[in-house]
């Protein structure tokens, strides 16, 4: 029994050894994978390494796909991020352009609406009554003719109205400011722009005024004055051409020329400034009171000082006008076309304390 059992055991071992020898040997274990060397990314214009498709895919050749180099993967990721950033920038630029176009469209709409509003305002009719206070003369209560403005207060009147007013007063008819102590006509100027506005606002006003002026001169047998035309500028080469008259012309209202001669002062008058210019041109409607005020202001006289003005042998009163004095005294008061007035300074006995 023991021998039979040992034979069976040996036979079994022999059959197992045959089976084992008939089976193919197991494949060797794969070698350990070492980290690949860092390969720099290809420069622009150079050909890079073969792609995965060229080396063979794992599904067709059972070969293990090569590991991706870190540098190449980083370069591709950077390229992808750069492309994505460029796309984002392009999208942002497109959005900004669209927003600008929308703003410009809104702005153009506002401009068009503003233009429409301005055109409506320009076409809006204004009642002439609203502008009447600005184009009327406060003296004659009519429309301004030959609009003349006072330079001290900028109030405007008809030329004839304000000149006639200054015959009796040296103050503005509106604000009562002193225009000039002795010669208010020096501080008025023609306002041609305002006169043009008046003529454009009031229909046929200019034509009616010209017709009335023409009829006025024609009824009295006088020559109708022609409008002033600009004179040609003389050539510097032509010696035979006449020299044009001076641009400065004395207003016809200032028709009286004075010669103021100082005859002396008593000892109690104190200090005073001498009169620098003794030749004065004024209106014939100016009074001796105006001349006295002129002398006081120019010479800086004390209020206690009295000014006596004499023409010939006559002591003149403050209310007398220069035209009346010339008419009353005659040519004896004249010297080379000048009205000679002598003045002296004394201290008033009523003001001595």
UniProtKB/Swiss-Prot annotation:
Residues 9-19, 69-82 have a biased composition (Basic and acidic residues). Residues 83-103 have a biased composition (Acidic residues). The keyword Nuclease does not apply. This is Polycomb group RING finger protein 6. Residues 71-112 form a coiled coil. Component of a PRC1-like complex. Interacts with BMI1/PCGF4, RING1 and RNF2. Interacts with KDM5D. Interacts with CBX4, CBX6, CBX7 and CBX8. Its main location: nucleus. Expressed in ovary, testis, stomach, liver, thymus and kidney (at protein level). There is a cross-link at residues 226, 237 (Glycyl lysine isopeptide (Lys-Gly) (interchain with G-Cter in SUMO2)). Pfam families: RAWUL, zf-C3HC4_2. It comes from Mus musculus. Transcriptional repressor. May modulate the levels of histone H3K4Me3 by activating KDM5D histone demethylase. Component of a Polycomb group (PcG) multiprotein PRC1-like complex, a complex class required to maintain the transcriptionally repressive state of many genes, including Hox genes, throughout development. PcG PRC1 complex acts via chromatin remodeling and modification of histones; it mediates monoubiquitination of histone H2A 'Lys-119', rendering chromatin heritably changed in its expressibility. Within the PRC1-like complex, regulates RNF2 ubiquitin ligase activity. GO terms for biological process: chromatin remodeling; negative regulation of transcription by RNA polymerase II. Phosphorylated during mitosis. PANTHER family: POLYCOMB GROUP RING FINGER PROTEIN. One of its GO terms (molecular function) is zinc ion binding. The modification Phosphoserine is found at residues 34, 118.
């Amino acid at each position: 029994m023991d021998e039979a059992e040992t034979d069976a055991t040996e036979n079994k071992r022999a059959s197992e050894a045959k089976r084992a020898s008939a089976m193919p040997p197991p494949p060797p274990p794969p070698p350990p994978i070492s980290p690949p060397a860092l390969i720099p990314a290809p420069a622009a214009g150079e050909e890079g390494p073969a792609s995965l498709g060229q080396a063979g895919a794992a599904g067709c050749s059972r070969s293990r796909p090569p590991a991706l180099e870190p540098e190449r993967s980083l370069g591709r990721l950077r390229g992808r991020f750069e492309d994505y950033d460029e796309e984002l920038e392009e999208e942002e630029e497109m959005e900004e352009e669209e927003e600008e176009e929308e703003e410009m469209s809104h702005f153009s709409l506002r401009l068009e609406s503003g233009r429409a509003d301005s055109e409506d305002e320009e076409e809006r009719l204004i009642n002439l009554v609203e502008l009447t206070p600005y184009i009327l003369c406060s003296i004659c209560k009519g429309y301004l003719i030959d609009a003349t403005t006072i330079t001290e207060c900028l109030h405007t009147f008809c030329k004839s109205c304000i000149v006639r007013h200054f015959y009796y007063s040296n103050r503005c008819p509106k604000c009562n400011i002193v225009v000039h102590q002795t010669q208010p006509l020096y501080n008025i100027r023609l306002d041609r722009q305002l006169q043009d506005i008046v003529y454009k606002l009031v229909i046929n006003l200019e034509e009616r005024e010209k017709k009335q002026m023409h009829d006025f001169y024609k009824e009295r047998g006088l020559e109708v004055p022609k409008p002033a035309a600009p004179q040609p500028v003389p050539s510097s080469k032509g010696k035979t051409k006449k020299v044009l008259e001076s641009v400065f012309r004395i207003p016809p209202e200032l028709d009286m020329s004075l010669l103021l001669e100082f005859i002396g002062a008593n000892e109690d008058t104190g200090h005073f400034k001498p009169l620098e210019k003794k030749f004065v041109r004024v209106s014939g409607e100016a009074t001796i009171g105006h001349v006295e005020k002129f002398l006081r202001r120019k010479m800086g006289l004390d209020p206690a000082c009295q000014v006596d003005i004499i023409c010939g042998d006559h002591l003149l009163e403050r209310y007398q006008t220069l035209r009346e004095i010339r008419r009353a005294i005659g040519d004896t008061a004249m010297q080379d076309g000048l009205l000679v007035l002598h003045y002296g300074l004394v201290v008033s006995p009523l003001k001595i304390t």
